[in-house]
UniProtKB/Swiss-Prot annotation:
Residue ranges the record marks as coiled coil: none
A GO CC annotation given for this chain: cytosol
Short sequence motif named 'KMSKS' region, residue ranges: 237-241
Organism in which the protein naturally occurs: Wigglesworthia glossinidia brevipalpis
Enzyme class: ligase
Catalytic activity: tRNA(Glu) + L-glutamate + ATP = L-glutamyl-tRNA(Glu) + AMP + diphosphate
NCBIfam families linked to this entry: gltX_bact (TIGR00464)
Record protein name field: Glutamate--tRNA ligase
Motif window: 'HIGH' region: 9-19
Keywords recorded for this protein, A-Z: Aminoacyl-tRNA synthetase, ATP-binding, Cytoplasm, Ligase, Nucleotide-binding, Protein biosynthesis
Single GO molecular function: glutamate-tRNA ligase activity
Lineage: Bacteria, Pseudomonadati, Pseudomonadota, Gammaproteobacteria, Enterobacterales
Amino acid sequence: MTVRTRFAPSPTGELHLGSIRTALYSWLFARKNNGEFILRIEDTDEERIKKISINNIIETMKLLGLNWDHGPYFQTKKLEKYNIIAKEMIYSGIAYKCYCSKNRINNLRIMQINKGEKPKYDGFCRNIEEKNIKNKRFVVRFSNPKNGYVIFNDLIRGTLKFKNSELDDLIILRSNKIPTYNFCSVIDDHDMNISHVIRGEDHINNTPRQINIFKALKIKCPKYAHISMILDKDRKKLSKKNQSTDVMKYIKNGFLPEALLNYLVRLGWSYGNQEIFNIDEMKKLFNLKSVGKSSCIFDINKLLWINQYYIQKLSDYDISSQIKKFFNKKEIDFNQGPKIENLIKIFKKKSRTLKEIFNQILFFYEDFSKVNFDLIKKYFTIDTNVHLKIFCKKLEKTSLWSVEEIKNTFFCTIKELNFNIKKIAMPIRIILSGSEHSPSIYSIIYSCGKLQTIKKIKIAIKFINDNKKKLNL
């Protein structure tokens, strides 16, 4: 049997972390078994579908490297086929037209709830005489078996059993001729020869309904595996209200695709105590038997730790290529400042995302006027400009550019002025980085370069002279 899996998102919003984990598990299962992976867009819900979401799905999958073998297929391209099959089901007696009004359905629901019963359609139109009904809108319902059980082996959860008496006659075709999710899913899984359906546990209740449709149509049913939900730290369903769930936002904020995949694959699956997996290891080691049943807790700090690991593995050049995208987005000319790779060498060590690196080096390319005035008031005095000019002159005279030469320039300056190094080092740190917290001042100056350092100090001197009153100096 050829393994064929599918990822079938509905483009109604951003691509959720949980959705990408589902896609990843389906993709890995196909790759592990030399099978095929299909991308299917379930876009029949016209009122909720967003074109931008379709583009988001495709772009995100590409960025993550989750390449598909077939697709993307769109359900809206098959509306005619769904309608033809629905008519055939009516003709063969496994589906029927339902003329019940919304008012009747609502009243039925209220009555059942008041009786303590589970709300479901009562089959009123199953045997209705159609000859007395003319020009009335209808939906098409599946004739679900009234007796017996639906029993199937979930590849993660084991044997699951459902009473048919608890399943109602679900709608397969709306009054506007648009097919519903469960119906489309069955037809598409059959047409695409899907062998394994891997999806979230929120779909478990859909599975017996789909299995009954498969059986009624006398077509082969795929195997099912339902993965656990992802919860937040309070053990509530992960949602954008309390934690960003949009995968694309994580990528745009400097999370690496390989880090996201590594984190998500471990969110429910394990291989011993190993935490770090490259994509080839995932394809080799992944199996559904090692996927847990329990819900998983999303831990942003764990994701940041993994992302930091992958950042350290990247070359300075590769990081620089990514950082330049942040500059371009802000329309800042990075060619007017220090070489980005030089700054990356000293700032990447403690950075957990590419965005953190960018934020730390941004000021090196901005005008000194954007500095936090509180820092100037805290560390600059009326004599600071004099100290900076002396330091600048000594720096200009250096013949070799090295960390040792920079240290020597500081030593000569503080010896001449007879004060603590902080009086000159902190102002220079703020002039170059815009922050009072940064790596070694010697490393910063060395990475910034001689000409850029002198240029920025002179600009700062002029700015401070022009704004003495404003700065209370």
